[in-house]
Amino acid sequence: MTNEELIAEAVKITREYINPQNVSIGHVGCALLSESGKLHLGVSIHANCDVGFCAEYGAVSSMLVTGEYKIKKIVAVHTGGTIFPPCGKCREFIYQIDASNLDTEVVLEKDKTLLLRELLPEMWQARPLK
């Protein structure tokens, strides 16, 4: 799947919805390709008391349900079509699911990707005290 096709899948699932409790649902959509080539999707939920989550969490959760852990390529897109790189929490989350995800291609533009390891040079890991 090309970057443009993956971006289009993420855009398809975004929506401008705010429920009566002022919770924003679906303003960001995420599409990822697992190692097997299967497409997984997720949307963001931003609640008032900070109990929501980024779209990447939804897409990764969808992948985990199928028994896969490795991500080949991922993109997150706002309703207006703007591509967002994963936030720091999502970068760490993707790495924590499987260390080989450091080689995940993160789509930053239609023609530009970086590996997760380039966006997360100092991932969390136990280090001995010196």
Question: What are the language-model segments listed below?
Answer:
Residues 54, 58, 89-92:
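Short amphipathic alpha-helical face segments that pack within enzyme cores
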Residues 55-75:
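Short, solvent-exposed cationic patches
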Residues 27, 43-48, 55-58:
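Conserved mixed alpha/beta catalytic, RNA-binding, or beta-rich assembly cores of soluble enzyme
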Residues 24-34:
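Short beta-strand scaffold segments in enzyme catalytic cores
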